[in-house]
């Protein structure tokens, strides 16, 4: 019987660049806020961007506050029924800055309706905006960006790790973009057996985290189902360091900005060491070697002009582990090792006062080693990408954007693989792997956003991509509309064609098959009600039709484009915020997903046809320093293919399993409860946060897979390694 497991994390924020012993003199910012007619605006918010320093205007429109922030800053003025205004200012230490501001009345522009607190953005259907603070506070998410996303409707965790499946699609149909670059392998332990994967993306390094589960715009290509669009911070606004210490990992990060504000840098380093965690939690899982991982990254930012910015993003990750796994013909350790390098150089500037031009150049390398019995492979994927985007308004009601990109990819695989899938012994027959494939993809898009009225917005675009390996091109038109019903509610609809070219792994064996680009057509209709971010309700229905999916031929390792399928479903989302104590949301998804994985067969349940998924997340502030939270998840079990019998193969001294209809079985219902608590305090005169989390409170034995004995006459459950942990 499992004993209660303990897991405690400590966050410590320390200044790497302390002030001098002399007290820094505070500066004063004051002034008045009026409307166009000269009347004072009461209750207007005045705040320094990126800080909590600010004030609110009184009945005479007057405001005044003190701040220790100095140098080049942006001050934001906003008020109900008025448009937001930003002012660039220079704040001198000990000085007084007087700012008298006039605010214009807001026009409630439909294309500018943005919900920022873990909700959705109109005009781009199914878009979820997350904040780093919310990500770190979600119980069970372990401060992981991708795990946090799975608490929203439309997405599911893959094997309780960080990889996600969206709206009945395959995880390979989800693509991450970082500052315009494609990020293909942002995970530690991504492909290991019964092991939770973790994201290499540091949410605190992101200024924009936007997740779209369908109906996304023409700027995104070569992806069928969903997009996670990340924007890293530009010039840091401060300097300091942040430390993290836990039972299983530790990390250190920091930011720096020079005095003139023209150079900045960030860094983050992390080390994953599971041995203390295993010993404290009395984990009986057998590891060889014990899981370890490292992650190192950062940015360098140069301000080249008033609007020009050059930013270099770097990230390196490494993981290594082995976990005990039993199969009918081999009982040993499944071992995997991964090395990943990602870098992106981006330059952006404003050619005019209202336009933006950006260009990025990125490179990534992903090296993987996998071994289990006779299987022993080493693969390496290289990606290079150049992309340019331009956006500008052409009139008061019309914005246009366009872009062009070229991406290079090569995939190499060496080693050996079993000839017979049912014989994995170390001395089993095998064939040698020694393959290399290269390809390129060129893409171009253009998009228009037109406001017919204050309540009606249309966004339409088209993109085209060309794949050099198969010499095939695609054209993808996309359209979305938003109509405001009332000040707080609107309806939205979207449709579009989406293509994704087959991965190079499908072209590795024998002659290059004539594979077509995979295609999905999205149809989305939704309703949303949002009252000042304190009450949000969203209901969205969708239908996706798949064609030209890569399918397996009954001839081993031959592939065709005969696959097809569909997904239909409904997503519901409800969020309630009761200031300042409570914040929580409920998400529900219904999915019906069918596909034809093999050539000529009927449609069956897809691998991620998870019919019902419900998540409930809550957070309660007991005081200004103490916060508790809880998450409850329940979902339909994943489909699987049962074994109904076996045939003995004397040449291999092994049994060949006889399978029932593909994905005709279901795992038991998945359920899990997670809780956490956070306490803010001072440690050695520095800001610190103590964080405790109890995952899988009821120690539910969620099924990972079934294993079978030598002749498949008996089976037993292999439960997930995500048992109860604190």
Predicted regions and their residues:
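C-terminal beta-signal and adjacent terminal beta-strands/loops
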Residues: 584, 625, 634-651, 670-674, ...
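Short, acidic Ser/Thr/Gly-rich low-complexity loop/linker segments typical of extracellular
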Residues: 51-62
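Surface-exposed extracellular loop regions of Gram-negative outer-membrane beta-barrel proteins
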Residues: 367, 415-424, 468-470, 474, ...
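Membrane-embedded beta-barrel scaffold of Gram-negative outer-membrane proteins
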Residues: 358-362, 484, 517-584, 589
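Gram-negative outer-membrane beta-barrel transporters
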Residues: 453, 543, 561-644
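Transmembrane beta-barrel wall of Gram-negative outer-membrane proteins
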Residues: 242, 248-271, 285-320, 334-359, ...
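Short, acidic, small-residue-rich periplasmic hinge/interaction motif at the N-terminus
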Residues: 20-26, 34-39, 44-49, 78-82, ...
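Periplasmic N-terminal accessory/gating domains of Gram-negative outer-membrane beta-barrel systems
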Residues: 83, 93, 119-216, 227, ...
